[in-house]
């Protein structure tokens, strides 16, 4: 569906089809028009695909994750043309600020840390990307989210690693936050930050008491916000299914998706 046909859709159907709100689409389009005018200030040949349709095709690729060949055929252009121009759209939007920007934290903030896995095709060096948890090859993305739902940082690792190891490699300083919530993958975080909370673990000799289970349940309920944010990011099928593209652009696309979520939540 091109931009002209999408004007017949209601706002709710537009959001379901493209993955972003209509107002967000218009703001992204304004950014692209400004960048295009600067790039082609001296004129040049008029492109076959308008900026409106180019943005629509790019968002359809991230939202539906069909092949470039299929989407290019829908818009009547060559596949290589769409690939080249879609990559320009992604880079331009991220450079313009549609990404995760670092936000200073205060003692009144509550932050939640979690990671998600994105499955990839089997690489040449299998063991570097093998996830024993999901029994597949995967990459990891770590997000730090405030209690209001704002993504304050996003870290990517192409090679699979433990959650706590990824946090240490990211070197994120969140000590200013009043409370830090994490799941059991971040055992040991309380040794770094005294305000951190992780679930209480049981052992064969020391099973969980009723109080421990109640604390774990309350912690899980409080940190559900980060799970909701990951669910929003994974409405883009590129993130929720097997990632087929070059892994070097995964971080850029993940930041773009998270930036769109932040923008639509009003941050």
Regions found by a protein language model. Name each.
Residues 1-43, 188:
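Charged, often Cys/His-bearing segments associated with DNA-binding zinc-finger transcription factors
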Residues 50-64:
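Short, amphipathic alpha-helical "recognition" segments used to contact nucleic acids or chromatin
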């Amino acid at each position: 569906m091109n931009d002209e046909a999408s004007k017949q859709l209601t706002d709710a159907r537009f959001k379901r089809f493209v993955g972003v709100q209509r107002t967000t689409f218009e703001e992204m389009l304004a950014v692209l028009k400004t960048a295009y005018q600067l790039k082609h200030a001296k004129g040049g040949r008029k492109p076959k695909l308008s900026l409106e349709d180019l943005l629509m095709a790019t968002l359809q690729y991230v939202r539906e994750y069909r092949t470039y060949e299929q989407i290019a055929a829908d818009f009547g252009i060559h596949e290589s043309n769409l690939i080249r121009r879609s990559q320009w759209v992604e880079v331009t939007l991220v450079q313009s600020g549609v990404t995760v920007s670092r936000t200073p934290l205060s003692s009144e903030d509550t932050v939640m840390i979690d990671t998600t896995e994105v499955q990839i095709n089997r690489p040449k060096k299998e063991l570097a990307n093998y996830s024993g948890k999901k029994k597949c090859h995967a990459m990891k993305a770590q997000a730090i989210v405030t209690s209001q739902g704002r993504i304050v940082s996003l870290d990517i690792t192409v090679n699979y690693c433990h959650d706590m190891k990824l946090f240490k490699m990211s070197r994120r300083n969140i000590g200013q936050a009043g409370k830090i919530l994490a799941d059991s993958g971040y055992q040991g975080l309380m040794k770094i930050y005294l305000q951190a909370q992780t679930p209480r673990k049981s052992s064969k000799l020391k099973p969980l008491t009723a109080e421990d289970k109640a604390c774990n349940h309350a912690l899980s309920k409080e940190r559900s916000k980060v799970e909701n944010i990951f669910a929003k990011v994974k409405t883009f099928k590129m993130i929720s299914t097997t990632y087929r593209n070059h892994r070097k652009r995964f971080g850029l696309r993940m930041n773009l998706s998270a930036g769109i979520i932040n923008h639509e939540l009003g941050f």
